Amino acid sequence: QISTSTWPMSGDEIQRALSQAKISNNAQQKVIDSIQNALKVDNQTAKLDLFAETDQKNIPQAFGDHTKAQYVGSLELNAGGENWDGKLRVNAEKDPQIDNGQDVNVEGSYIAGKLWNQWLIAGQMPTYWGPGHDGSLIRGDASRPVYGFTAQRAEQKAFDTKWLSWVGPWQYQAFAGQLDDYEAIPDAKILGFRLTAQPLPYLELGASRILQWGGEGRPESWDSLWNAIKGNDNFNDGDDDKSNQIAGFDGRLNLQPLLDVPVSLYGQYVGEDEAGLLPSKKMYLAGADFSSSYKNMPYQLYAEWADTRTNGDAKGISYSHYIYQDGYYQHGFPLGHAMGGDGEMISVGGDIRFDVMNRLSGRVMYAKVNQSAAHFGDDQINKAFPEDDKIKALDLTWTHYLKPTLPLKINGWVSDSDRQGNDAGASIGIEIPLDRDIFGF
């Protein structure tokens, strides 16, 4: 079993899991074929991505939705070997939903090297920490990616020594980067560490921690960083309080090995501060998913609940800080859950693979966003949802492979907002490999 709660994932681990997969029916083979198709598309030497939508989609973003503008054209080049990998992705955007002041960017680009089962990566890649389908409380991908460095294991193998083998397959991810256009504290840094382990075949546990630290006018000495890492800076004094910190735990329980039921239960909680060495001022997420097949068509269903209020109350604390006054956001869009702080969301969704060339996914949701909007007045830090609002939405995506390496995605949505009224729209995206075979040469 492979852990999918820490993104980006290592290609080494994906290939290892595929090579060890025990396929017992056609539905499972379809899942494997779909994954291999997706890998082929992602690793094309050169490709052109085109995206357009009729209107900006003002609902909490789904996991993996990396398009941040209404019209996007991207040229991508990929290269690599056994111990190195690189991607250059140049994106041209028009009518951005997340305005970073640039019409052209290199989001999604990176260069990486591997040594002793460790990848060291420099670039601007989407990151996601947690078991949720529709959001992570601590590190989501609803904002533009943060520039920085990432380190993680190539393969999630267990320790060889008998003293630590009980930990099971494990992974870590360490990140250090700098926030872009963070006006409250220019050049503010973000540092994070996540650790996951599977001590039992049916149980995965994770722990994550994030620090906002440094920046213009703030201490950036090794001593101040060490105090922040130790947690010795939780004071209401700007001279002593060196960082804004968020930390928490998550877990996933797979009931298939225990009860022969294809259901998993998962949960996550994080806190804005600590009390008694554990996170306090907590936010919560919980869900369940079910996997099966219908007439050899594999499908998955899930239900998820998230609450980014503070211990169930909207107090203007979640994802905010009195020194880092732009909060836990970049360009005003959340670095944590897609709805931002002081929100509640219930979603039900899933996907079905009709065959190796066709997949349908979708979700329905109800969200109460930015319930502390009155607290911030004219100084809203949540630009994704700057008003106290209630949103109901249906979001559907059909993915059709015109050829095994030529995916076409068509998305449609309808929504109803107390503030903005009814809305509907559609988008289309296509990834075109730039090789001779696709054009019939």
Task: For every predicted segment, state its role.
Residues 60-63, 93-97, 134-139, 179-181, ...:
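Extracellular loop and loop/strand-boundary signature of outer-membrane beta-barrel proteins
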Residues 148-325, 341, 346-348, 353, ...:
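Signature for the C-terminal beta-barrel architecture of outer-membrane proteins
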Residues 52-58, 81-83, 92-96, 115-117, ...:
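Transmembrane beta-strands of outer-membrane beta-barrel pores
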Residues 3-7, 25-26, 34-46, 80-86, ...:
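Short loop/turn motifs that connect adjacent beta-strands in outer-membrane beta-barrel proteins
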Residues 36-92, 120, 170-174:
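Transmembrane beta-strand segments of Gram-negative outer membrane beta-barrel proteins
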Residues 195, 400, 422-441:
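Outer-membrane beta-barrel "beta-signal"
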Residues 1-65:
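N-terminal periplasmic/intermembrane-space "pro-region" immediately following the signal or transit peptide
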